[in-house]
Swiss-Prot record:
The gene is gltX2. It catalyses: tRNA(Glu) + L-glutamate + ATP = L-glutamyl-tRNA(Glu) + AMP + diphosphate. This is Glutamate--tRNA ligase 2. One of its GO terms (cellular component) is cytoplasm. It is found in: Cytoplasm. Monomer. GO terms for molecular function: ATP binding; glutamate-tRNA ligase activity; tRNA binding. Its main location: cytoplasm. The lineage of its organism: Bacteria, Pseudomonadati, Pseudomonadota, Alphaproteobacteria, Rickettsiales. Keywords: Aminoacyl-tRNA synthetase, ATP-binding, Cytoplasm, Ligase, Nucleotide-binding, Protein biosynthesis. Its EC number is 6.1.1.17. A motif ('HIGH' region) lies at residues 10-20.
Amino acid sequence: MTKVITRFAPSPTGMLHVGNIRVALLNWLYAKKHNGQFILRFDDTDLERSKQEYKNAIEEDLKFLKINWDQTFNQLSRLSRYDVIKKLLLDKKRLYTCYETPEELELKRKVQLSKGLPPIYDRASLNLTTEQIKKYIEQGRKPHYRFLVNHELISWHDMIKGEVKYDGKALSDPIVIRADGSMTYMLCSVIDDIDYDITHIIRGEDHVGNTAIQIQMFEALNKIPPVFGHLSLIINKDEKISKRIGGFEIATLRKQIGLEAMAIASFFSLLGSSSQILPYKNMDELATQFEISNFSKSPTMYQPEDLVRLNHKLLISVDFDEVKERLKEIDATYIDENFWLSVRPNLQKLRDVKDWWDICNQTPNVENLNLDKEYLKQAAELLPQGEITKDSWRIWTKEITNITSRKGKELFLPLRLALTGRESGPEIAGILPLIDRKEIIKRLT
């Protein structure tokens, strides 16, 4: 059986966002599931927009999510190889030169759209005479190159969408080499996939048209195309996710919002599938349950609050030994196991533990809360004597009920507000032993 090899091919022109990290995760998990290899390729042929700092940031995000790669390379290092294939396809008459300026092409596009026609290149350059070409060269025009798409049926079995068919007539011949000599994504991606023996490609359904063209490129080079799978797009409030929509970058999720790596990985690996979205502890567990066949063809709604809830579920199950090193990262080495176990059920993000430490160790400002001072004074007098334990809360509130007849919210909420300054949070039974007895009396009176 052929060894499974997948790849993730980001362009270092911006930060990773939730759409392309989902693609990275699924390609990595598919390779892991089948004991294969995962390759990281940087599509950096856009010389103007590609930046080293984006490449570094992409690698940092992938490492944070424990997405490790077996090989990595960038396309700029392979220009001589692309040139060989360029000459081969020119000889096969599957590449042809064009001399239109960007302004001329834009005008053609606008005219087609105004007539209700799709903006498909008219192949005018195929009919240029030798004299016309000579004139363009004398004008200083440099050619760009297009791939000639055969006007025939293109079909493949998609891992997610099932049978997909495309009419070659509906596809525009893509520019594969720009006038400045730089390569576009289309052809060099195919060359890389051939040379690195890529067997499976999972990507967004916005690439379906590209896939149809690239299948012809594989065939023009006498190679069998990889198996493709096209994911439904992630949408948020009726617009697809892209790196141009702010707030969805992985760096934002992990640095500014403070989400756990496995919460992010679990969520986006399962989003859009029939599998229940659960917080997995590690990537090996996630790979074990991963099934590409579980993914839906329908668009997938991304609600950021669902991700935060999953992060909460993950933290609830994290033992103190697992989190000790992480506490060092957020300068919270003063947190001990008892405190962690007490506040863990109410943490949305790890750094929230510092807020709860402050609540327990710093008197909250309750001046504007309009507290029932007489009731709180009475409650202070009823606080059980001796050491404060987890049983103290039960004993204390029972005695308060006996004396005041208060129950439920009428009993609990004033105590919570006075002790924590908040209407909700960890169980008071858990944090009460963490507050010094004198401090409890002080907050109540």
